[in-house]
Amino acid sequence: MSFTDPIGDMLTRIRNASSARHEKCLVPASRLKVRIAEVLREEGFIKDFVLHEDGVQGAITIVLKYSADREPAISDIKRVSKPGLRRYVATDSIPRVLNGMGIAILSTSKGVMVDREARKQKVGGELICTVW
């Protein structure tokens, strides 16, 4: 099955599973998706993820994170740069998500990173998504 926007599909699966209070969600794997999952884990939005290698593509099982009263750690996750309209930002125009309460994930020449790290390293890139 071919997707127009595989990253958007991953983010939608995470958003839907989180709002339905599921423990895990399964996503088809790619190197970019694995790196996005690593960033989400480092920033504390998901508990963990497991990469399943099975033949050509594989899959990622993402373990979602909730508070003690079952509120999801991810309030919202939005795709910014889409296949039909790519959004690139320079270092000085990287947005602050909810005044620093959320994160923006960028794909830069130095890899996939959060907005704080991109500002620190003074690199811009493609604004993949925002999470809060």
Curated annotation (Swiss-Prot):
Keywords tagged on the record: Ribonucleoprotein, Ribosomal protein, RNA-binding, rRNA-binding
Signal sequence bounds: none
Domain of life the protein comes from: Bacteria
GO biological process, one term: translation
Any GO MF annotation of the entry: rRNA binding
GO cellular component: ribonucleoprotein complex; ribosome
TM region(s), chain numbering: none
PROSITE patterns: RIBOSOMAL_S8
Database matches in PANTHER family: 40S RIBOSOMAL PROTEIN S15A
HAMAP family noted in UniProt: Ribosomal_uS8_B
UniProt record similarity statement: Belongs to the universal ribosomal protein uS8 family.
Subunit structure: Part of the 30S ribosomal subunit. Contacts proteins S5 and S12.
Function: One of the primary rRNA binding proteins, it binds directly to 16S rRNA central domain where it helps coordinate assembly of the platform of the 30S subunit.
Protein name as it appears in the record: Small ribosomal subunit protein uS8
Species for this entry: Anaeromyxobacter dehalogenans (strain 2CP-C)
Phylogenetic classification of the source organism: Bacteria, Pseudomonadati, Myxococcota, Myxococcia, Myxococcales
